[in-house]
From Swiss-Prot:
Function: May function in vitro as a polymerase that catalyzes the polymerization of the O-antigen repeat units on the periplasmic face of the inner membrane, leading to the formation of the lipid-linked O-antigen molecule. However, E.coli K12 strains do not normally produce the O-antigen in vivo due to mutations in the rfb gene cluster. K12 strains are phenotypically rough, their lipopolysaccharide having a complete core structure, but no O-antigen.
Coiled-coil segments on the chain, per record: none
Full protein name: Putative O-antigen polymerase
Keywords of this entry: Cell inner membrane, Cell membrane, Membrane, Transmembrane, Transmembrane helix
Superkingdom assignment: Bacteria
Organism listed in the record: Escherichia coli (strain K12)
UniProt-annotated location(s): Cell inner membrane
Keyword Cell inner membrane on entry: yes
Transmembrane segments: 23-43, 57-77, 97-117, 143-163, 180-200, 215-235, 312-332, 338-358, 361-381
Membrane topology per record: Multi-pass membrane protein
GO biological process, one term: lipopolysaccharide biosynthetic process
Any one GO cellular component localisation term in the record: plasma membrane
Gene that this sequence comes from: wbbH
């Protein structure tokens, strides 16, 4: 059964890739990712305390195909209405981007230094990061992403786009400064999400078809992935163990603690943004996004995006796939014509690329709103010039 599902995912991905000629097309990403997850499960199946059953595989297949069809239909309908619009390429004046970027970097470094000064460095970088992470879990209002992440992400994307049309010493210096802030942001944020969002955004904006940048991308992914998993985490075990923990275990946990039966420790964060908003208005306390660890042959506290949906009802999962697929298709199509949408979509890709890991489409509504506002504000200062 599992090989049939993998085959369907791969065939669907290749059909969509043939039609759209873009590896970042939503349906292509989702189908390839779930094919890789299931292949990873087959390679490491002896590690788990539970095995994937046919009901779970059928559920995954139906949800992924629902997302795919919603994306294709919505994007195709939109394309019929705007296909006569030229896919104009715009150049953002790099000098203006550098000025805005330096201002953002300056404020970011001041904030980072203030935050880091609140913690006493321990015996290792790992213990230092754990101290910061524990403080953020207890007090989510102190989380770095809540303050600076949307601004830095927007500035980074604008810089990458403007850098496509310039190659100056100023650009190289600015790249170094952005990288330094980025590394400190990882240490302060102690999360993986910002790392992958930046990597995906860079790959989408630059274009993986450019060989030189593709090599840089693969190198960056390899270095960051190895650094995070082997050095910062310091966990025992080989590559199969890490593959299991970060790629496959969420689906196993979803099946055992949500899909087959809802455990006592289960919860849903699909409406977390609205719950937190109501908490701010009424003075209440919102639920933490951190879920409890469970044992599936190894420890994990992520349960795929589907867990947040099926906790309420299985029907909600299909509805969310329709909504998510439609929005993703629209954004992909509009990103071909508008820089602002291209920048937003470069980060929105994360929502469907990591469905197998956790829910970020609904729970990160606040971030999507903040990034949108940042793009709107920056667009008032940065006037793009049509060059083709």
């Amino acid at each position: 059964m599992i090989y049939l599902v993998i085959s369907v995912f791969l065939i669907t991905a290749f059909i969509c890739l043939y039609l759209k000629k873009d590896i970042f097309y939503p349906a292509v990403c989702v189908n390839i990712i779930f094919a890789l997850v299931l292949l990873g499960y087959e390679i490491t199946s002896d590690i788990y305390a539970f095995q994937l059953n046919d009901a779970t595989l059928i559920f995954l297949l139906c949800n992924v195909l629902t997302f795919t069809l919603s994306c294709l239909l919505t994007e195709s309908v939109l394309d019929l209405n705007i296909r006569k619009v030229n896919n104009a390429i715009y150049s953002i004046p790099s000098k203006k981007v550098h000025n805005v970027g330096l201002l953002v970097i300056s404020f970011s470094m001041i904030y980072i230094c203030m935050r880091l000064s609140n913690y006493q460095f321990g015996t290792s970088l790992l213990s230092y990061m754990n101290l910061i992470r524990d403080a953020d879990v207890e007090d989510t209002s102190r989380n770095f992403s809540a303050y600076m992440q949307p601004i830095i992400l927007t500035t980074f994307a604008l810089f990458i786009w403007s850098k496509k049309f310039t190659n100056t010493k100023v650009s190289k210096t600015f790249t170094l400064l952005v990288f330094i802030v980025f590394i400190f942001a990882i240490i302060l944020n102690t999360g993986k999400q910002i790392v992958f969002m930046v990597i995906i955004s860079y790959a989408f904006i630059v274009g993986v078809n450019r060989v030189k940048h593709y090599v840089y991308l693969i190198t960056a992914v390899g270095v960051l992935f190895s650094l995070y998993m082997l050095f910062l985490r310091g966990l025992p075990g080989g590559m199969a163990y890490y593959l299991s923990m970060y790629l496959v275990s969420p689906i196993i946990a979803f099946q055992e603690f949500y899909f087959q039966q809802v455990s006592n420790s289960a919860s849903s964060h699909v409406f977390w943004f609205f719950e937190r908003l109501m908490g701010l208005l009424t003075g209440g306390v919102s639920m933490s996004l951190h879920k409890e660890f469970v044992w599936v042959g190894l420890p994990t506290n992520v349960y795929t995006a589907f867990s947040d949906y099926v906790y309420i009802s299985a029907e909600l999962s299909y509805l969310m796939m329709v909504i998510h697929g439609c929005i993703s298709g629209v954004l992909w199509r509009l990103s071909r014509n508008y820089i602002s949408v291209k920048i937003f979509y470069s980060y929105f890709i994360y929502t469907f690329s990591f469905i197998f890991y956790h829910e970020s489409f609904m729970t990160n509504i606040s971030s999507w709103i903040q990034i949108t506002l940042c793009i709107i504000v920056f667009s008032q200062f940065l006037k793009a010039q049509k060059i083709k």
